[in-house]
Each structure stands twice: as structure tokens, then as C-alpha cells.
């Protein structure tokens, strides 16, 4: 048997605080790790500290949670026992995401949908919680119905409560000692003009995918109707 680790966090960022207020939740971010020391922890989040709206598949590290500030973060860790086959399936799913990181982007529309009570399904676009739950579904830990609506970290908490192994501050989580990471890209500043351009392009990609996906679904429904009306 092996273990997969899910980490929920209550980050001190402005975006994190807004999400917690609107969702009335304690946690605002979800991550998944292949190792207990969180050396292989992944999620969908911002690419750079300076822009919370543009993101995608990322490998996470402690300083991402606080944007480099000297603050601690409340986390909850769930240690989920899985078979060797489940572990490899989950690992392969994550690594495929990593290889296709240019196409897999953060679903900022879905994040807004959580706040507005509307679900945006977008091709190859995920929120942090979408990604964690989809990964667990791939490994047959959770079931498809878990994604029938917008899912938030506190709902993941309810689904995985029996696997909880740690609740407290990130800095006090002992297994994290000695983890190596490169934070240079995350804290790189590209300037206000570039950030605006990145944001506009990011939302253009999301909206375009939503329009294309809507036409695709409409086409499929039309084909099904023709079959049943013949």
C-alpha cells in the first residue's frame, strides 16, 4: 500500500480571503502530493505572485502560500491509502498534466462561478479543487458525482475527513523539513503592462474554449435528437 496526500490551506493572500468570505469556508486552496514531505505537491494556481488571475498547473512549495511573506498558514493534511495500481494511475494523470501544462490553465471563470453560484465547465481548465477531485476520481478514490457542481476545499474536507492526519500550521508540519524548490520564477516581476496583457490573453483563451465547448455540446445533442427522431 502507498499513500496520496491532499493538503487544504487557508492562505493569507487577498484572493484567499475573498474566496473564504464568499464561500463561507475556512479553507480556500487545495493541493495534492505524491509524497509525505510535500516535495511533489501540485495544484492549479497563479503562475506569479504578482498576478492572481493568470495561472495553471504548478508545482507548489511553502512560500507560494504566503507570497513570500513571513506568515504561517493553517493547513489540513489527508493521507489516503491507495493500492500500487491506484498510485501509479494518479501519478500518471498528474505527470500528463505536467507535460501538457501549456494547454492546462487555471479556470478563473469557474473561480468566479463559485462566488456567483454558477458552474463554468471549460476544456482543459481547472480550479485547484477541480484538479484535486479529478485526480482522486482518476484513482478511484472518489466518484464522478463529486464534480456535479462547483466544489470548494471545505467540501473536499468533508469527503476526506476520515483520512485526516494533520491539522495545524504549515511550519510545524515536520515532514516538510529539507524540501528543495526553486521560487525564482514565481517571484519574478514582468511589469504592469505585461501583466495586463497576460490577463487579457488568459481570459480570451477561457472564453474561446467556453464558446467552442458550447457549440460542441449543442452539436452532440442535435445528433442524439436526430437518432431518436428517426
Cite the ranges covered by each PLM segment.
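Cysteine-nucleophile amide-bond enzymes
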Residues: 1-230
Amino acid at each position: 500500500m502507498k499513500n496520496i496526500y491532499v493538503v487544504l490551506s487557508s492562505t493569507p493572500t487577498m484572493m484567499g480571503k475573498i474566496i473564504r468570505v464568499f464561500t463561507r469556508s475556512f479553507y480556500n486552496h487545495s493541493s495534492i502530493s505524491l509524497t509525505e514531505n510535500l516535495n511533489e505537491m501540485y495544484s492549479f494556481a497563479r503562475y506569479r505572485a504578482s498576478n492572481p488571475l493568470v495561472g495553471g498547473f504548478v508545482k507548489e512549495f511553502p512560500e507560494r502560500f504566503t507570497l513570500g511573506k513571513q506568515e504561517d498558514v493553517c493547513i489540513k493534511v489527508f493521507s489516503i491509502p491507495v493500492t500500487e495500481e491506484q498510485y501509479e494511475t494518479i501519478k500518471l494523470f498528474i505527470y500528463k498534466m505536467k507535460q501538457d501544462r501549456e494547454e492546462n490553465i487555471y479556470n478563473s471563470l469557474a473561480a468566479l462561478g463559485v462566488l456567483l453560484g454558477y458552474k463554468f465547465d471549460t476544456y482543459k481548465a481547472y480550479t485547484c479543487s477541480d484538479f484535486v477531485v479529478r485526480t482522486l476520481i482518476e484513482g478511484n478514490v472518489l466518484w464522478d458525482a463529486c464534480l456535479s457542481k462547483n466544489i470548494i476545499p471545505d467540501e473536499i474536507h468533508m469527503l476526506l475527513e476520515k483520512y485526516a492526519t494533520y491539522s495545524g500550521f504549515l511550519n510545524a508540519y515536520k515532514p516538510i523539513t529539507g524540501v528543495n524548490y526553486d521560487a525564482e520564477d514565481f517571484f519574478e516581476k514582468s511589469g504592469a503592462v505585461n501583466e495586463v496583457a497576460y490577463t487579457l490573453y488568459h481570459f480570451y483563451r477561457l472564453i474561446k474554449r467556453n464558446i467552442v465547448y458550447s457549440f460542441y455540446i449543442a452539436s452532440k445533442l442535435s445528433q442524439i435528437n436526430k437518432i431518436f427522431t428517426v
